[in-house]
Amino acid sequence: MSSYLIKPELSSAYPVVSYAKGSYVYDQTGKKYLDGSSGAVTCNIGHGVRDVTEKLKEQLDQVSFAYRSQFTSEPAEQLAALLAQELPGDVNWSFFVNSGSEAIETAMKIAIQYWQEKKQTQKSIFLSRWSSYHGITLGALSLSGFYERRYRFTHLIERYPAISAPHIYRLNHETEEDFVQTAADELDTMIKRIGSQFIAGFVAEPIIGAAGAAITPPPGYYERLSEVCRTHDVLFIADEVMTGLGRTGRMLATEHWDTVPDIAVLGKGLGAGYAPIAAAVVSDSIIETIKQGSGVIMSGHTYSAHPYSAKAALEVLRYVLKHGLIKQSEKKGAVLKKKLDEAASQSGIIGEVRGKGLLLGIEFVADQKTKKVFPPEQAITQLIVSEAKKRGLIVYPSKAGIDSGEGDAVIIAPPFTISDGEMEELISIFSETVAAVEKNLKKD
C-alpha cells in the first residue's frame, strides 16, 4: 500500500501502531513495545486510561469546539484554575495553545508586550543557552542552541543562544560551586554587553531535554541565575514543556532550585498524549501590568483553549493528583536511576546517567576516562535506539549536550505509572541493547 504521509525520514519504514495500553504500545503485526520514553516524553500517565477517555467521550457529545474570542468553556476555566492552585508562587494565568513551540512563542510575545506596557519598548531581545531546544517554529528555534535543527534556517532566525549549558559531567577541575558562580557571571556579562534595556527575557529548560539528555544543573544554579535576571530587570522564562507537571518529581522542575519563573511554559505532559495542548502560564504581576495597560494580549490561535483539549488536560492533571503520581515519579525515578547506574558500571561505553525523577539521560562515550565522544559517522545514538526497538523497547534519541553538536545520548522517561516489573523489563532490555551495540563496536 502506498503512503502519502510525510514521515520523519522519508525513505524509512515505520511500524503501524494498532493500540496502546498502560506502558505498552502494539503494532499491527502484534509486536509489543515497552514505552520507555512515554513517546516523546509525553504520555505521563500511560496509554488508555479510562478515567480520561470516558470523560473525553462525554466532552465530544457536549461541545467539540468554541472559539476563544466568542466563548469560554468550563474545561478551559477549570484547567486554568487547577493550574493556578497547583503551580508554585504567583504563576497563575494560563494562555492555552496547541504545542510547546506555540507556547514558547506565546511566552516571548507576552514578555515583549509586558515591557511595552511599561514603556520600555526597546526590550525585545531574548537570551538562551547553547545545547538547548525550545521548539521547531522560527521564534522557538531562534532560542534553541541546537545546531542540527538550526543550521538550515540560520538566515531566518535570531541568534539568541549565548550562555553555556550546565554540563557538570564535562567540568574541568572546577567545583560545582565555582561553576554556578561562573554561570551567573557569564549571564551577567552577556546582559551588560548587550544592554539590559534591550533584553526582554532569559529562557531556559530547567533540565535540558532533546539537546542534552537530561543535563541537570548543580544546586544553587537557578537561584543565582534568576537573581541576575531580577538585578537587570530581565524576565526568567522556564521552558517546562518536557520537565513540567511531575516529570522530575515536582510540579515544576524549577522547584528543585527553590525558584519560581515569571512565565512557565507547559506542553507534552499537559495533555499527556490524549490531546494536543500546551500553555504559557504567567505571573500575576505581568498580567496586572497588561490589564492596566492595553488590556489585551496580542496572540491567539483558532484552536487555543479548545474545549476537548482542555478537558483532556484537566482530567490528566486530576488523575495525576488523585493517584499521587508526582511523588511516584520521584520515587520510581530514584529506583530507575540506581538500576541504570548499575547497568552503566557493566558497560564500557556509558559515560554518565543523569536527571531527576523519571527524566533520565544516558550519555555514551568512546573512552570513559577521557570522556571522548564517538565519531559522528558511527551513529551510536541511532544504533542504540534501533537495537532497543528491535528488542521491544522505545527510548528517545538525544544529543549529549556538547556545543559542537557531537556526542551520543538517549533519554529514558517512562510513564509515571510504570510498574516495578516493567522497570525490571526496561533495565533488562536496555542492558542487552547496550551490550549488543558494544559487542558490535569491538568487532569493527
From Swiss-Prot:
Keywords, in A-Z order: Aminotransferase, Pyridoxal phosphate, Transferase
InterPro entries linked to this entry: Aminotrans_3, Aminotrans_3_PPA_site, PyrdxlP-dep_Trfase, PyrdxlP-dep_Trfase_major, PyrdxlP-dep_Trfase_small
Superkingdom classification of source: Bacteria
Enzyme Commission number: 2.6.-.-
GO molecular function, one term: transaminase activity
Cited PANTHER family: AMINOTRANSFERASE, AMINOTRANSFERASE CLASS-III
Protein name: Uncharacterized aminotransferase YodT
Species this protein is from: Bacillus subtilis (strain 168)
Organism classification: Bacteria, Bacillati, Bacillota, Bacilli, Bacillales
